[in-house]
């Protein structure tokens, strides 16, 4: 697994709520690494590092290299980030160990490109995104950061399906998802509600004026 994003972490001696609170008082985020048929490892990391990854996007399918001083690096996925209910600051992170040659479930995001070239959108159609993510199984060495949906050739009423996505080589759809499932579509243009209401009001006013005694007929 080459080109992993490295995150600097520190080991923690104790687990539990009290130890986690103490870690937060030190300005760090408590975290755990589980899986791989090993005992969980209790770690901590800089909250700015996690926030950077959350804002970067694609973190749910990105394999990280967790590097602690004096320990072997660990390849892992972020499985859960708990956020403070008021500040949205990260307060705990769950990592899962991964190894090449195994299959893991991940949610991979979809990047939509070519919207400005779509004939349907040029004619007033609207992009209707059904899925922003797809659940797949993949070897950690082959997890894409995103799939690509090409919109440049789509007209009104055309769809993008799983089989149309680029970057799906080497991955398998998660259970319960069909290969012909719709990812996005170009919907027909709709009449602006305000314009429609204004036209109706104008027509009603003209009809009322025409019905008044003495009104001139055109």
From Swiss-Prot:
GO terms for biological process: translation. It comes from the Bacteria. GO terms for molecular function: 5S rRNA binding; structural constituent of ribosome. It holds the Pfam family Ribosomal_TL5_C. Signal peptide: none annotated. GO terms for cellular component: cytosolic large ribosomal subunit. InterPro entries: Rbsml_bL25/Gln-tRNA_synth_N, Ribosomal_bL25/Gln-tRNA_synth, Ribosomal_bL25_b-dom, Ribosomal_bL25_C, Ribosomal_bL25_long, Ribosomal_L25_dom, Ribosomal_uL5_bac-type. Keywords: Ribonucleoprotein, Ribosomal protein, RNA-binding, rRNA-binding. Belongs to the bacterial ribosomal protein bL25 family. CTC subfamily. Part of the 50S ribosomal subunit; part of the 5S rRNA/L5/L18/L25 subcomplex. Contacts the 5S rRNA. Binds to the 5S rRNA independently of L5 and L18. This is one of the proteins that binds to the 5S RNA in the ribosome where it forms part of the central protuberance. This is Large ribosomal subunit protein bL25.
